[in-house]
């Protein structure tokens, strides 16, 4: 509740999605959904669980690099938000959309160097190499796909709030590049998670309150960067 309140008081609209891979105990997930959180899933198992718990497809974010054709068919049919990780998935999703006679809104997962954390390059499309630009082009020319969102996840237990500010600004720069060179219109950013907890003392030997920044420090920089970077959008 505090995290939600902190972000919503600084920027609007904000959507929180509960990561099922973090804890998919039904009772925990239900509490998060009662607090208006969406479901963020990375597998068919997690997707099925979210639906069984009553989460509608349009409130599910389907992440992960290994989605099957059957999983994508169900997600598309139920209106889930699909994040694509690699070119093969773009081709598979295009085939699914065509077979179902739908235009599917797509979010691209990006990876890049923020300058503050070790780059997570295993998943998503790299900006620096031009891979992300190429993937965006492939989506843009498809009559069955529509690029509407950008996603990145820069790590876990990140104790430097400026890493998130850099993340937002890099994503915004890439967004402007796409929008200035095509008909693409980005509607939202998914900035992942990774905020440190004072209850999870990973490699920390001092009292957590001396090491872990308050959530307000993260929200100030993230929301401030979002406001600045989107202020003059057409």
Segments (PLM) and residue ranges:
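Active-site-proximal beta-alpha core segment in soluble small-molecule metabolic enzymes
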Residues: 12-188
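C-terminal active-site-proximal or functional interface alpha/beta core segments in diverse enzymes
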Residues: 159-234
């Amino acid at each position: 509740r505090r995290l939600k309140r902190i972000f919503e008081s600084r920027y609007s609209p904000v959507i929180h999605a509960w990561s099922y891979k973090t804890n998919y105990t039904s009772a925990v997930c239900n509490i998060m959904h009662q607090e208006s959180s969406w479901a963020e899933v990375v597998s068919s198992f997690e997707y099925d669980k979210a639906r069984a718990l009553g989460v509608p497809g349009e409130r599910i974010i389907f992440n992960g690099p290994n989605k099957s054709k059957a999983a994508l068919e169900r997600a598309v049919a139920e209106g889930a938000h699909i994040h694509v990780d690699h070119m093969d998935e773009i081709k598979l999703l295009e085939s699914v959309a065509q077979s179902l006679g739908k235009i599917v809104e797509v979010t691209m997962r990006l990876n890049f160097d923020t300058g503050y954390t070790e780059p997570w390059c295993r998943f998503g499309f790299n900006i620096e190499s031009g891979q992300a630009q190429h993937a965006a082009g492939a989506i843009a020319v498809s009559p069955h796909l529509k690029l509407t969102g950008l996603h990145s996840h820069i790590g876990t237990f990140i104790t430097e709030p400026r890493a998130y500010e850099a993340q937002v600004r890099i994503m915004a720069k890439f967004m402007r590049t796409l929008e200035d060179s095509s008909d693409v219109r980005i509607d939202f950013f998914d900035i992942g998670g990774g905020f440190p907890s004072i209850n999870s003392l990973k490699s920390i030997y001092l009292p957590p309150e001396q090491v872990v920044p308050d959530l307000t420090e993260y929200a100030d920089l993230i929301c401030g960067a979002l406001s600045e970077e989107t202020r003059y959008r057409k």
